[in-house]
Amino acid sequence: MAPPIEVSTKSYVEKHVSLPTLNERILSSMSHRSVAAHPWHDLEIGPEAPIIFNCVVEIGKGSKVKYELDKTTGLIKVDRILYSSVVYPHNYGFIPRTLCEDSDPIDVLVIMQEPVIPGCFLRAKAIGLMPMIDQGEKDDKIIAVCADDPEYRHYNDISELPPHRMAEIRRFFEDYKKNENKEVAVNDFLPATAAYDAVQHSMDLYADYVVENLRR
């Protein structure tokens, strides 16, 4: 078992996270289903969210294949092969039991030493937010580190990363759709507190979504 991670943001959780979360209470009533587990809806986000949370990996570091979650089946499908001569610089996926305005779970890029297979999940720690506009629509990304990687778990804010690492991430997202004639704009990276707020907001949107569906 990995040694405990010291996070200096305990006060943030106490102020912004009510336990038990609405997500957990509502979804527990939906657990008596004879269907396969769905990584978006059935995997818990984790008790330390929005700082440390579970992340489902869709795309492994170094991959040119754009995998994504099939929201109907819960399986990971091949969406396309990237048109540009680039590969994902880090593992990429989503945070379960979250929801954004585009009706998808919130995206997260996880910095760690090794690539991992699509469909697995890991514990990630938010260190920053990358505001992004994809074809005119908001598509922000949480930047995180693997909470169980001894090389990266001590990072608490994106400002602690080497400047080259941040430039690498920015350049990938600016370029990876250029050969599809799709415009992507990446704004300045925001600190860890902005990432916590974004994750918490997506958790709240998901909880509201579940409530509305239970009322139908």
UniProtKB/Swiss-Prot annotation:
Arranged from A to Z, the UniProt key words for this protein are: Cytoplasm, Hydrolase, Magnesium, Metal-binding, Phosphoprotein
Q: List the disulfide bonds.
A: none
Which positions does UniProt annotate for Mg(2+) 1 binding? D102, D107, D139
Kindly list the positions annotated as binding substrate. Answer: K66, R80, Y92, Y176
The primary gene name is PPA4
Q: Which CDD domains match?
A: pyrophosphatase (cd00412)
Q: Which residues carry this modification: Phosphoserine?
A: S18
What Enzyme Commission number(s) does the record list for this chain?
3.6.1.1
Major localisation: cytoplasm
Family according to the record: Belongs to the PPase family.
Q: What is this protein called?
A: Soluble inorganic pyrophosphatase 4
